[in-house]
Structure formats: structure tokens, C-alpha cells
Curated annotation (Swiss-Prot):
Molecular function GO labels: RNA binding
HAMAP family in the cross-refs: MatK
Gene Ontology CC, one term: chloroplast
Gene designation per UniProt: matK
Protein name according to UniProt: Maturase K
Keywords: Chloroplast, mRNA processing, Plastid, RNA-binding, tRNA processing
Source organism, top-level taxon: Eukaryota
BP GO terms, sorted: mRNA processing; RNA splicing; tRNA processing
Species of the source: Aristea glauca
Leader sequence residues: none
Function: Usually encoded in the trnK tRNA gene intron. Probably assists in splicing its own and other chloroplast group II introns.
Length: 522
């Protein structure tokens, strides 16, 4: 990365394209191959093999693919004509080769486009004298903030940020950050052809679904720039309202995914200007207290104001997306609810406000009277139904929650199969440690444990009961003991099993920098 930074600093002053030539540098694809293709951190990762490929990147083949992309209809030629071997020579499976090298270009593209963003971020830290480790804040840091602030709020808007219809919109947004015209031109062409290619793989050849699932790095980066554009109004308020008291935190969870997390924005008054959309008319929305939380494509907007105020904000977002990005957005995708009567799903938790009434008897001399006190508590629960639905998509169970075996893992060793299931279980326990009631995780653990036993029994052509008796407590320890050791660092005393005796303890960890895969699947 130091070599890339030096290249960037060297050519920054020149008025000519300097990012586009990086597409033809060998180390770009070596870096992409090392981080993008082999650096999969998913707990559902299944080894994917491209037949006949020796796991070494070939710059000549990548250059050949880039050249072919510029030719008319060449990107889809291996699909339309199985006898044509344009990309990689004569081979029996051109589909896997073409998707593989297209994925390589996508990963290399992401590394190149990240250069201006990452260097800008580093320079910002140096100017503000912010240590790097302060930037890597945990996802769990959002929930103590919600617990502290949402107790006094009235309404909450559950916003699902829409996906743009046209790929060209994403490229136009990047023009504000990148001035390299050839790179942007090639990016737009690549996104357009990739969209056609991806649609073909999903509809015509389901066996090649891995191509549509693995190319995420570039599209996450481009999508994040689009989401930042959606938050233009908030940035405008911070920069142009000198009298506005504004607290903002922006953290990038991980550089390789380039996700931006807006923890919260706190304002005393909010003024929204619609001068571009309504012929110079100014609309002022004032709110004594408002908070905005976003992670990826899901945002939460809460306020102490009235329901009318929240409806104004709702129509502001709808009009902003329609007029600025030129695509229709359904207003029903923004839900406005009263916090005291609803629960909202955010970051893998079902959050709500619980009101408990406590009665206290007060004795004064000969008179006694009762005092009723209502206590409001911010509650975070484990969404068991969502998790079971995610497990069924993996698949580890049926839609109704009945555990099933994992046939694709039967070629692995017994210890590796147990370790995989145990890792999934520990990740879930770690991620949902902040739940006030963890009893729901017992069912998830049961599904994973029995699915593991069914997988092992299928591998050895035995029954589940026989295999469970053979393993004894070894299988149980793999699912529970390691989680117990992690909790023992926080809880005052050791516990025999994870969550036993601590099912009401809420623990927020500071080392969670990515959303659990089951949360994304749900």
C-alpha cells in the first residue's frame, strides 16, 4: 500500500489520469487476489474452486479481458457461444474462467478507487490528531447510545435507503471524488456489463451463484459513496450553520469494505433548504432534539417532535431521492412509529421501550399511601424468528426450525466440521451478548448442535443417536466452553455454561467491527 500511496502523491499535481494505469500493474491484482479472493471472513464460507485454475493470477489474461470488454458484446461471448474461447484459450469451462477474471478486475478496481478515499481519511486523522485505533469503534457502541438517548424520544422513523436503478448514477456520484475520466468511463462500462452478466448468472445458471455473491468489495465502496450523497443535507447543516450545535461521528469499520457508520447527529434546530426542488422556496423544519443513526443501508431517525414533523422529514427524504437521483421511491418504505408502542429491527436486534410499573408503600406517622412509579427501559431482544430464517437459507435447518445436515461439508474432517459449527455458535453468542433475554439463543444453539450431529452422522453413514453417544460431552464443550472463557473476563465469576445464570446480563463488546453474517442473511 505504501507503493500505491507514493504513486498517488507523485502524480496528484499532474492534470492527467493517474489511477487508470494502475489497472495494468501486476501488484494490484496480487493484492486483490490475496485480500479479495482468499480473504473471505464469512462464517458461511465454503471453499470455491475454479476448475483447472492453479490459484495464480495472470496479468496477461486480465489485460486480455479488459481489451475484450471494450469490444461489442464480447463480455457475454462465452455464454452465447460455448465454442468461442476468447478470454482464456481452449478450456471446458469458460464460464468459471470469465467470472473469475471479472471478479479479479472488480477487486483490483476497488483497491484503486479506494486510494483517494483512504488517503483522504488518513490526512484527516493527521490534521485532527486522531489516533487510528479510535476510529475503529465497535458496532455495539451504537446500542449504549440508543439506550441513553431514546428513552426521552417520542417517534422513530425506520428508513430503508433505496438502491439506485441506474448504474450511471453511481458513477456520477464518484465524479465528485475522482477526476480520472478514463477510469470513470471504464467503471461505468464495467458496471453496465457486470449488471447484464450478473443477471444472466442468476436467472440462467444458478450453479454459478458464487460470482454474484463474491464481487462485493467494489459495489460496497460505490454504494457507500451513494449513501453519503443521500446524507448531503446533514453535511450541509454541519458546514453552513454556525449557530447550530452539532455533534457528529463518522467511523469506517474496516478499510477493505469501506463502510461508513454514522453514529448519531445531535442538533438543537434543524433547517432543511429545498431551494433546488421547489423554485427557491425555503422550508424550515425545526426540532429541539433529533438523532440519526445509520449502518449500511438501514437508518433510524428519532425525534422529540410531533408526528407531523416526522411526516415532513419522511416526504423530504422521498422528494430528495426522486429529484436528486431521478428514481421513484415508495413512501411506505419509511415507517413512522411511536416509540412507546413499537419495536424496530436494527443491527440484528429487536429494540423497544418497555415500561414497568413499581409500587412503593410510604409510611408517614399514622398514615400510609402507595406511590406508583413508571420506569422506562430500552430493551434489546434476540430476533429468534429472523435467525431461524437465516439458518434456513444457509441452510442448517428448515423454515420451521427443524435441524438438517450440511451435505457440502461432509468431505471435511470431523474436527473441522465441529469447529465450523462451534465458530458459528460462538459468533452468535458474542454478537447477541447485549440482549436482555438470551433464552432465545438456546434454540439456535440446539439447531446448530443437532445440525452438526446430523452432518457427522451422514458422513459416517450412522444414526444421530449413535454419533451423539460416541462424542459424549466433547460436542457440547465445543459449543459452550470457549464462550464461557470469553465471558469470564467480564463477569465476576465463572459460569458452567454460556448464558446460564447470566441470561439477563447485557454485555456490549468493543471489538465487533462487522455485522454478523446471520444478521445480513435475515
Amino acid at each position: 500500500m505504501e507503493e500505491l500511496q507514493g504513486y498517488f502523491e507523485k502524480d496528484r499535481s499532474r492534470q492527467q489520469p493517474f489511477l487508470y494505469p494502475l489497472l495494468f500493474q501486476e501488484y494490484i491484482y496480487a493484492l486483490a487476489h490475496g485480500r479479495g479472493l482468499n480473504g473471505n471472513s464469512s462464517i458461511f464460507y465454503e471453499p470455491r474452486k475454479v476448475f483447472g485454475y492453479d490459484s495464480k493470477s495472470s496479468l496477461a489474461l486480465v489485460k486480455r479481458l479488459i481489451t475484450r470488454i471494450y469490444q461489442q458484446n464480447s463480455f457475454l461471448s462465452p455464454v452465447n457461444d460455448s465454442n468461442q474461447n476468447r478470454f482464456v484459450g481452449h478450456h471446458h469451462n469458460n464460464l468459471f474462467y470469465s467470472s473469475f477474471y471479472s471478479q479479479m478486475i472488480s477487486e483490483g478496481f476497488a483497491i484503486i478507487v479506494e486510494i483517494p478515499f483512504s488517503l483522504q481519511l488518513v490526512s484527516h486523522f493527521k490534521e485532527k490528531e486522531i489516533p487510528k485505533f479510535h476510529n475503529l469503534r465497535s458496532i455495539h457502541s451504537i446500542f449504549p447510545f440508543l439506550e441513553d438517548k431514546f428513552l426521552h424520544f417520542n417517534y422513530v422513523s425506520d428508513i430503508l435507503i433505496p438502491h439506485p436503478i441506474h448504474m450511471e448514477i453511481l458513477v456520477q456520484i464518484l465524479q465528485c471524488w475522482i477526476q480520472d475520466v478514463p477510469l470513470l468511463h471504464f467503471l461505468g462500462f464495467f458496471l453496465h456489463e457486470y449488471h447484464n452478466w450478473n443477471s444472466f448468472l442468476i436467472t440462467k445458471n444458478k450453479s454459478s451463484y458464487s460470482f454474484s455473491k463474491e464481487n462485493k468489495r467494489l459495489f460496497r465502496l460505490v454504494y457507500n459513496s451513494y449513501v453519503s450523497e443521500c446524507e448531503f443535507v446533514f453535511v450541509f447543516l454541519r458546514k453552513h450553520s454556525s449557530y447550530l450545535r452539532f455533534i457528529s461521528f463518522r467511523t469506517f469499520l474496516e478499510r477493505r469494505y469501506f463502510y461508513g457508520k454514522m453514529e448519531h447527529r445531535q442538533t438543537e434546530h434543524l433547517i432543511v433548504v429545498y431551494c433546488d426542488y421547489f423554485n427557491g422556496t425555503l422550508w424550515f423544519f425545526k426540532d429541539p432534539f433529533m438523532h440519526y443513526v445509520r449502518c449500511q443501508g438501514k437508518a433510524i431517525l428519532s425525534s422529540k417532535g410531533t408526528h407531523l414533523l416526522m411526516k415532513k422529514w419522511k416526504y423530504h427524504f422521498v422528494n430528495f431521492w426522486q429529484y436528486n437521483f431521478h428514481f421513484w421511491y415508495q413512501s411506505y418504505r419509511i415507517h413512522i412509529n411511536q416509540l412507546s408502542n413499537c419495536s424496530f429491527y436494527f443491527l440484528g436486534y429487536l429494540s423497544s421501550l418497555l415500561k414497568k410499573s413499581s409500587t412503593v408503600r410510604n409510611q408517614m406517622l399514622e398514615n400510609s399511601f402507595l406511590i406508583d412509579t413508571i420506569i422506562t427501559k430500552f430493551d434489546t431482544a434476540v430476533p429468534v424468528i429472523f435467525l431461524i430464517g437465516a439458518l434456513s437459507k444457509a441452510p442448517f435447518c428448515t423454515v420451521s426450525g427443524h435441524p438438517i445436515s450440511k451435505p457440502i461439508w461432509t468431505d471435511l474432517s470431523d474436527s473441522y466440521i465441529i469447529e465450523r459449527f462451534g465458530r458459528i455458535c460462538r459468533n452468535l453468542s458474542h454478537y447477541h451478548s447485549g440482549s436482555s433475554k438470551k433464552h432465545g439463543l438456546y434454540r439456535i444453539k440446539y439447531i446448530l448442535r443437532l445440525s452438526c450431529a446430523r452432518t457427522l452422522a451422514r458422513k459416517h453413514k450412522s444414526t444421530v443417536r449413535t454419533f451423539m453417544q460416541k462424542l459424549g460431552s466433547g460436542l457440547v464443550e465445543e459449543f459452550f466452553i470457549e464462550g464461557e472463557q470469553g465471558l469470564s473476563l467480564i463477569l465476576p465469576k465463572a459460569i458452567p455454561f454460556i448464558f446460564q445464570g447470566s441470561h439477563r446480563e447485557r454485555i456490549w463488546y468493543l471489538d465487533i467491527i462487522r455485522i454478523n453474517d446471520l444478521v445480513n442473511h435475515s
